[in-house]
Amino acid sequence: MLTRTVTKAPDLPETVVIGFDAGTPVSVNGERFGGVDLIATLNEIGGRHGCGVVDLVEDRLVGMKSRGVYETPGGSLLYAAHSELEQLVLDRRTLAAKDLIAPRYADLVYEGRWWTTEREAYDAFVNVTQDRVTGTVSLRLYKGSIAVVGRESSNALYDERFVTFGEDDVYEQSDAAGFIRLFALPARVRAIKDQELGLAPTLDAPAPEATTAEHPALQIA
C-alpha cells in the first residue's frame, strides 16, 4: 500500500513545493530529482498524508464497466500543481483547447495508439503550450486533501497592476462600455427579432423597427 488511510495520517498538515521547467516536474522542496526519484519522493509524501486514492467506475475498451481503486499519491500531487501552474501562465483560449485535447490524448494512450500521427500532432500542441509552464506551486496536504496555497512563475499572466480596475496604461474604464455593447450584440439582435415576431414580451414598449439606424440597441457607442 502506498497510501495511508486518512485516520492514520498525521494530525498536522505538511506543505510541499513542486518545481516545473517547461511543464516537466524537476524539484521537490527545492531539491532537484530525475523523473523516477521525483515520483517516488512525492509518492512517499502524498501517501503519508492519505492523498491520491482514486475509487471509480470506468468503461473498458471492449465496452464493459468495471470498478477500479488506484493509488497515485505522487500523480495526484503533480496533477494539482501542474494544473494550477497552467492556470497562472496560459490564457483562457489555450486552456480551453487543452481541456479538449487532454482526454483525447488519455484515450489514445489507454487504447495503445501511441505510434500514430494523432499522437504526434497532440505532442506538437503540448510542446508549444508547456514552453512557458515554468515555476513553483505550493501544496498543503492534510488527511487526504490537497490544497493549493501558493504559486509563482516569471511567466505569470496575472499582474496586480492590471486587475485593480483602476486607471493604468493597459486598461481604461471607458473601454468597457463599447466592449460590452459589442459582446452583447447577438443577444440584442435576437431579442429585437423575437419582439418583431411576437415571441417575446415587449414590457409595454413598442417593438423596434427593422433598420439599424432606427434601433438604438443596435448602434455601437
List the model feature ranges, each with a label.
Residues 1-221:
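Nucleotide-activated chemistry modules centered on ATP-dependent adenylation/adenylyltransferase
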